[in-house]
């Protein structure tokens, strides 16, 4: 019997990636997206942790779908900026800004920081909320150094 899970995101790339992983590992799971849920109200990310914001989104998804719901929150934590922008990464240059504007602002803010002191971590947290009330989170971090200009996708 195929199980269903909701991926509580509007990001088509995340949906494609999760579906690819499910096929790769031969799991009998159908992944639904927010487009499959009628009148889904986008929750505000009001927490100060990645875990808290991922849980807000997963809880909202589970409540509106009745299905197990997965959601994530992620961002960049720059040592020289006191680990900011952190949970505010997608809004660092203001609400509704594109990723490039947020990246450019971070780079302007650290332009006087020497190359050897541009440490940063990309943090991603995935939350799963089950209809029976159980909640799970997992966290991944990638540490590195910021360059002087945006590169990659």
Q: Could you describe each region identified by the protein language model?
A:
Residues 2-6, 12-32, 36-153:
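Anionic-ligand binding patches
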